[in-house]
Amino acid sequence: MSGKDAMLKVRQWIEQERLVVKEQKDPRAEMHLLIRYPQGPQGHMFAVVIPKGRDLVAVSSMTRVDEGQQKEMSTHMKEDKEAWLEWIHDVRLQLIRTSVDWGIHMGHEGDQKVGPLQAFNVSLPLWFDGLTKNEFMHTLRKLWLAKLGIIHEIKFTHGPGIGKPGPVDDWVKAKREGKQPPSSSNEDSDQSTHHEIEFDEKMSFGSGFDPSEWA
């Protein structure tokens, strides 16, 4: 399958499933789409990218943790450090068990990244030789369920939040260093009844193929 064939098929599948889609300008990609999955106001935003020079489709999604939940985590860290370390360890294990690529962004304390959990992303590649509608749709579903697992764990342990996205220190640092951090919009988080997440609206695909750059 060629890159043009892959782009055509992905667009057809998105249209067939009536998913909301936004075109993104990305000089490093043959195609860069943002789609909402599943349908409806509770859907999450996913980046669907075909990087230049690669024979794959990268699917990814970024989740930003609510400011109120971050404050609860900070309190948890101070009151019971061992319990906090166990909790974040369990989050990592849960992500590993989902069999998706993932990355987490922890709050900075000096040179250390001790917490709270500020954002996380999930991603999967789909190579052209295995690209079918079934694989594409199940990839979206798998990433969505991986996100939901962590979102519900955060909500159960640290409350529903205050409806305001919290800071992401890694993005602030990247901006200071002249790098382009992911940007986000309140448009999608405002449509969530629980308000614990905010969606990345940039999602540029990096040349290094670090999964954290897929979202």
Question: What are these language model-derived features?
Answer:
Residues 155-211:
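Short, highly charged C-terminal tails/helix-capping segments
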Residues 64-119:
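Short, internal acidic amphipathic alpha-helical interface segments
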Residues 38-40, 53, 64-66, 125-129:
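Generic structural motif
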Residues 78-97, 128-161:
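Ampiphathic alpha-helical segments that act as solvent-exposed interaction surfaces
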Residues 1-58:
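Charge-rich, low-complexity N-terminal segments
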Residues 55-60, 114-129:
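Glycine-rich, often proline-containing surface loops adjacent to acidic residues and nearby aromatics
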Residues 46-76:
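Short, conserved beta-strand/beta-arch hydrophobic-aromatic motifs that form part
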